[in-house]
């Protein structure tokens, strides 16, 4: 079984909550293979994010943890994913692009659940 990362949309962000449990169903997550995410880590390293709660500002994705991606970072996230060399051949990335666009349109935070 291949390792996967999960990406979803947080419908009601809670400033005090610590997101630490595996809840892909709650956020209607889609899966992206680890091999793809490994190639995106460096280009995403300058993206403003939070690790586990809004009280922990960081940059990039928490590879083995939970990342909260704020609405102001979604354009950068989308640009990196779209510019990935194998974007057109990847069903996973096509689904991720749809999820990012939905979050942008709804001005919502995204959640990344690492491996």
Question: Each predicted region: which residue ranges?
Answer:
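Acidic (Asp/Glu-rich) sequence patches and key acidic residues
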Residues: 1-106, 115
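Conserved GNAT acetyl-CoA-binding A-motif
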Residues: 111
């Amino acid at each position: 079984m291949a390792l996967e990362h999960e990406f979803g949309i947080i419908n009601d962000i809670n400033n005090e909550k610590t997101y630490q449990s595996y809840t892909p169903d709650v956020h209607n997550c889609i899966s992206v293979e680890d091999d793809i995410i490994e190639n995106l880590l460096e280009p995403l390293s300058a993206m403003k994010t939070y690790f586990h709660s809004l009280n922990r500002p960081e940059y990039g994705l928490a590879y083995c943890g939970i990342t909260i991606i704020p609405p102001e970072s979604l354009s950068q996230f989308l640009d990196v994913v779209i510019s990935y060399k194998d974007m057109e051949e990847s069903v996973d990335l096509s689904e991720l692009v749809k999820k990012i666009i939905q979050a942008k349109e709804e001005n919502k935070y995204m959640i990344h659940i690492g491996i």
